[in-house]
């Protein structure tokens, strides 16, 4: 519940900020371009990228329970400031605070999962899928709620969101205990220094996972904010032939996002329950193929203004199916990262903090590339850039699969029959 409410607030702020920036000139601020949206989104993930290893190490030293409570405090401060200003520099600073919110909480939660699922790959698959599901459900619900709340409350909705952050803090404070005592404890007073952190990373296999995970997150990052901005801004005469750039209302965008989030959520649950029967890399490969099918169908829809309605409905089938399959790549990659933390029981928080690092790098690349692509070619640019990122993600899978065989021998004996 803590992850759900925290991510709800994160998604709500992110989407409402897009609506706010799209009409910032009406509130006395400047006009905002696609590039500005990209920079703001990148700032959020840059903060998460830079601060996650630090907070992961602090969680290993001081306890997961204590450190995760900083997240909602940073988030509440950010949304209050967002509702009070139209200054782009201050709004950019609030994106850093929001990123710090995620950086403080996520490594602590993932360290908890890594300890709680020791020696049980079935439980680990379900746990990481549920973490991703809670993350997606929270972000999705926040993004979907942003349209109605912005329509009803406008800037006052940011202050309401601060209350939700307060609820998240209360859940972490009173509803979560540090798991290390229940598992024999790895409590230690040794500081996880930068040198120690680099030593851990040099001995782990995480760098083989990094290219695929970064590219997948870049593909997702292309759409996290740019798509909303492209959908809701007024029609651009340069892209009059693109059906998806007709200037939709926030309520319509929220409805479409709700359907997409439900499909993605269902995919997370389905593929997370396949860890015992299928290799992580196999699930990731299927996900990348599903993403490519989604892009191809979306291109046809975007240029299908003259197509009969029945043909458009048929094209929605590979969009929905591709999204469902693509969803499996996220818990599979997270499961691999948890497997790689097994040899480092005292440093799980630091290693699992790489989840946010890789996510942050991918989202920064995706956000900036998406801003440039959308500014140049609209939705077509986003779709082409997505296909490029998916192609990059599939390239390292062969080497990653070899590492997975080694992990099977080390921590999952008897798993060699997996497909």
What are these regions (language model features)?
Residues 177-211, 414-419:
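Juxtamembrane intracellular "pre-TM" segments in multi-pass secondary transporters
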Residues 4, 89-104, 309-328:
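Hydrophobic core of transmembrane alpha-helices in multi-pass small-molecule transporters
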Residues 50-63, 266-280, 374:
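Helix-to-loop junctions at the C-terminal end of transmembrane segments
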Residues 44-53, 139-140, 261-269, 363-364:
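Residue-level signature of mid-helix packing/kink "hotspots" within the transmembrane helices
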Residues 94-135:
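Cytoplasmic helix-loop-helix junction between adjacent transmembrane helices
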Residues 49-86:
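Conserved MFS/SLC helix-loop-helix module at the cytosolic interface between two early adjacent transmembrane helices
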Residues 28-43, 126, 130, 237-261, ...:
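Loop-to-transmembrane helix entry
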Residues 66-81, 282-298:
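Structural signature of the two symmetry-related core transmembrane helices
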């Amino acid at each position: 519940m803590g992850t759900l409410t925290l991510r709800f607030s994160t998604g709500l702020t992110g989407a409402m900020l897009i609506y706010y920036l799209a009409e910032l000139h009406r509130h006395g601020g400047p006009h905002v371009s696609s590039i500005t949206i990209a920079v703001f989104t990148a700032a959020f993930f840059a903060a998460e990228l830079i601060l996650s290893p630090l907070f992961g190490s602090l969680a290993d030293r001081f306890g997961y329970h204590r450190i995760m409570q900083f997240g909602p405090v940073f988030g509440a401060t950010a949304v209050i400031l967002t509702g009070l200003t139209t200054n782009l520099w201050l709004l950019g600073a609030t994106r850093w605070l929001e990123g710090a919110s995620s950086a403080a909480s996520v490594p602590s939660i993932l360290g908890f999962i890594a300890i709680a699922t020791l020696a049980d790959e079935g439980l680990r698959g379900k746990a990481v899928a549920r973490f991703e599901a809670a993350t997606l459900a929270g972000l999705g619900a926040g993004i979907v709620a942003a349209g109605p709340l912005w329509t009803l409350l406008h800037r006052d909705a940011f202050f309401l969101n601060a209350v939700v952050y307060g609820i998240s803090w209360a859940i972490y404070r009173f509803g979560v205990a540090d798991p290390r005592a229940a598992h024999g404890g790895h409590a230690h007073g040794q500081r996880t220094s930068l040198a120690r952190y680099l030593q851990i990373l040099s001995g782990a296999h995480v760098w083989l996972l990094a290219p695929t995970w970064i590219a997948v997150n870049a593909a997702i990052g292309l759409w996290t904010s740019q798509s909303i901005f492209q959908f809701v801004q007024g029609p651009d005469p340069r892209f009059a032939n693109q059906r998806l750039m007709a200037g939709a209302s926030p309520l319509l965008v929220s409805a479409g996002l709700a359907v997409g989030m439900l499909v993605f959520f269902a995919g997370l649950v389905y593929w997370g329950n396949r860890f015992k029967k299928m290799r992580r890399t196999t699930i990731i490969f299927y996900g990348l193929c599903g993403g490519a099918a989604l892009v191809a169908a979306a291109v046809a829809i975007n240029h299908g203004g003259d197509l009969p309605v029945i043909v458009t409905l048929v094209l929605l089938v590979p969009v929905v199916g591709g999204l469902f399959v693509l969803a499996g790549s996220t818990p599979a990659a997270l499961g691999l990262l948890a497997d790689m933390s097994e040899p480092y029981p005292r440093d799980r928080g630091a290693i699992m903090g790489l989840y946010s690092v890789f996510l942050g790098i991918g989202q920064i690349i995706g956000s900036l590339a998406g801003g440039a692509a959308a500014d140049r070619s609209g939705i077509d640019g986003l779709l082409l850039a997505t296909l490029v990122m998916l192609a990059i993600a599939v390239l390292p899978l062969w080497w990653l699969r070899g590492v997975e065989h080694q992990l099977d021998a080390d921590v999952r004996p008897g798993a060699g029959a997996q497909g």
